[in-house]
Every structure is written in structure tokens, then in C-alpha cells.
């Protein structure tokens, strides 16, 4: 995924961070900061099988997104990745809470961070 070597049947978390040095894409940082999140029950996610062509689109989006700014934050990154391969598009929003609501509105979502794939992502944190 992106520039991270992901083994078969493995998981990774990918996000942009503005409160780190350097800023930009980090792998598995969310996984490692799970105990610091204020309310993990507010976390929403969807899982899906994807084709090779969709994976290529996702990788291209990740590889061209190693930046962070107020108008290019983690929410914008998540929307770009979602829209690069999703059948359902999400319109622009500026906060994680707004994005959460848009994901909920797409239907068939899950909540929390007890998902085994999320919990089993490697502990290592790697900058893009």
C-alpha cells in the first residue's frame, strides 16, 4: 500500500499527520495511538475486496499525497483515497466528524476499533 510492503492477508493503517516531524503520510500510526484516542466508539470504517486496478489507483493516490496542511489534512486525504477506488463517492468536508457522518450515510459500516485487522496491524510506525 503506497510505499509500504504489505504481505498477503495483512493490515496497515495509513494517515496524514500534521503534528509530527516530518508531516505527511505515516503507516500504522493510528494503530499505535489507539489507546490515546478520546473515544474509539466514534471510529467508523468499511471493509471491501478490491481489484488490482482499484489497488493501483489507491496506491497512486497515496504516493502523491505525502503532504499535510490546514486545507489538505487527514480528512481530505481519506476522501481522496476513498474516491480513488470507491464505487460510492464522498463529497468534500473539512473535519473527521463530518467524514464519519458521510461514511455512515453510505450504509453498511462498522464502528469501534475492535476489528481484528486494525488490531493486528504491525506496531511499527513508518514515515512514507
Regions found by a protein language model. Name each.
Residues 1-43:
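Glycine-rich catalytic cores of cysteine/serine-nucleophile enzymes that process amide/ester linkages
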Residues 29, 33, 53-57, 98:
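Exposed alpha-helical structural elements
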Residues 42-56:
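A structural motif
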Residues 56-128:
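Activation targets extended, charge/polar-rich intrinsically disordered C-terminal tails
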